[in-house]
Every structure is written in C-alpha cells, then in structure tokens.
C-alpha cells in the first residue's frame, strides 16, 4: 500500500497515536541480529483492513485560528511537528507558524530576511521537546527558536549538494545533515558538523549508480524528510535503503530491516532512472 501523502491539515495537527500493537507475524527478531526484520512480502500476503480506532487512543479535531498574521499557504503537511504541546505548521518559503493545542495562534517562527534569526530560503522545521526548541532549516544554517517565537541561536550547516537537504540538531553543538544522492555518485550520505559548519564526521554513501544520458539529477524530493528524532535518538532512513538506522557520533546502528522479498525494486526500475 502506498502511504497517504496529503492528510488534511487538521488531521495532521491533531491526531495523536498513543500506542500501536504489532502483529507478531509481521516482525521477527533473530537472536544473531541487533535489529528487527520486517517481512514485507509475508505482510502483503496477509493484508487486512485496520481501523484508525484500533491504533489511536484518541482523535481530536482542532481548527487552526485564522488571523491576518497566521494565514497559511502551501503547507508542508508531512513536516508538521509538535513541541511540548505547541503545534508548528511550516509553509513553503513563508516560514512556520506556532499554535497551541486548542488551535489558538501563538506566533510566527522566523521570517524572511538576512539578519539574525531570519531565513533567506525556508526549507523545513524540526523540534526537540527536551530542550523546548524549534529549529528552522534555511540555506546553510539552522535557526533555533522557543515555541513562543523567541530567537535563540543559529548553527551553520555544510553547503553540500542540494539546498533542501534536511538537518536536525543531535546535541547542542552538533548538526546532522543528509546528502541526497541526486547524481548517483555522492561520496557521503550523512554529515556531522559543529556550530560553524565544519565537518566532524562523514558517513559514506555506498549506493552508487550511473545517470542515464541526458539527465542532470536523479530522483529527489524536497517534501521528503530522511531524518527525524524519536525518544531522544536521531533516526535516518534513505529513500531506497531497506534499513532504518539510529545515528550516533561514531556510527550508524541498524534498527529495522524491511525485507521486501519478491517486491524489492530492481535498481534499473528506480524512479531516478525512469524519470526523463
């Protein structure tokens, strides 16, 4: 099944998934492996309908307050986040807007400009509830804000590859950025950098391919987020990679392996070599 890409704004802002119970037939853990193997092929053969009420403890409809200062346009629905009850809604090249849990508008998060706390090109948002911070990704920098819109700090990020590549803050002084393999020949896939944008560690990209004649870039999508944080860990999953990793300062640790079986996509059938 294909994931639903465009959920309504209110649903994205208010649905809370409290707990999910896994079907044991869908996951297997080998005693010799440090990660969980998810047998996709077997799961497809046993496909069944699941009601939202089976996996969600509570559903709340939250209308967003509409004011002259909070008019939303071109919402990045897949990048809506929540930080300690503050709902942050990003809009393409407009910045982000903060609302409380009742939908009342709080403040804009960053604005376009060239000064401290301002972006030249708005790309995405990330959050850290432990630090009570919201991060705005702009070209070559991450900007930190409090949920009330107060500017806190800026972090430089490496200017490598495409401008919309995603970044998150692993620690107070370390930024993790992904490199989209848009040419098929990227040397690295993840970069750890300090607050000045200097590279601390680079993780190699092993998935290489040749570009078809007449193409400049392979498949890439500025609406996809390959990095996120979950329970204090930084998580990474690339577009065509079958493994989900957690990232530390020193290594990539495999957590889940999606065993596609006969559904594994051949390299020559990938979107990146099929789009002309």
Per-region residue spans from a language model:
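Eukaryotic scaffold repeat domains enriched in small/polar residues
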Residues: 20-276
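Sec-dependent bacterial lipoprotein signal peptides
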Residues: 1-18
